[in-house]
A protein has these predicted regions:
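N-terminal pre-triad scaffold of radical SAM enzymes
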Residues: 1-18, 42-46, 50-53
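Detector for the c-type heme attachment site
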Residues: 22-25, 60
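Conserved alpha-helical substructure of the radical SAM core
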Residues: 26-53, 74
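Conserved SAM/AdoMet-binding glycine-rich loop
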Residues: 46-169
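C-terminal, non-catalytic macromolecule-binding modules
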Residues: 150, 170-180
Length: 180
């Protein structure tokens, strides 16, 4: 529909998850220039877009390659100042890169939908290591609790991989319990 649009802020991925071909297909992570992103968003608002969906293979890495630090929170604050948008949604927030600044920005900006799309993939530390990802059930639970503490009505969306090579029935059951 004409009232919704996707705004791609970067291309590629540097995460190198063992199951994923995106880095080979799309190449290394490359942030767009923040001014170009804001200008494109202004054009979308002028055309009547009300819901803006901010996307990249890993939105939380935005800016690290160009500016030497994460810039997603700053970008979101700038997008919120654009007249016309009612809702701004952020997709594909890699769990290792979710900062307190990002959580605070999502919590504090009325236009940002209180919705976190975080591809967790699994909760078992051994499975995550074989996936070439970080964390474990404890660290992921701590992250989710931190987000819920600052954004009480947050809605989470995630993806999980079951049947990953070497996953035991016990690890599968742990994931099923975690995701419930």
């Amino acid at each position: 529909p004409p009232y919704t649009a996707y705004l791609k802020i970067a291309e590629g991925c540097d995460n190198r998850c063992s199951y994923c071909a995106i880095p080979m297909i799309r190449g290394r992570f490359r942030s767009r220039d923040i001014e170009d992103v804001v200008k494109e968003a202004e054009g979308l608002a002028e055309r009547g877009v009300k819901e803006l969906n901010v996307i990249a293979q890993d939105t939380t890495r935005f800016g690290e390659d160009k500016y030497g630090k994460p810039m997603l929170a700053e970008l979101l604050r700038r997008l919120c100042r654009i007249d016309g948008f009612k809702w701004i949604r952020v997709l594909y927030c890699y769990p290792d890169r979710i900062t307190d600044e990002l959580i605070d920005t999502i919590a504090g900006e009325d236009k940002i939908v209180k919705y976190m799309d975080i591809p967790l993939q699994h909760c078992d530390g051994d499975v995550l290591r074989r996936m070439n990802r970080h964390g474990d059930r404890e660290s992921l639970t701590a992250l989710m609790n931190k987000i819920k503490d600052k954004i009480p009505n947050v809605i989470f969306r995630s993806t999980f991989i079951t049947g990953f090579p070497g996953e035991t029935e016990e690890q599968f059951n742990e994931l099923a319990e975690f995701a419930a």
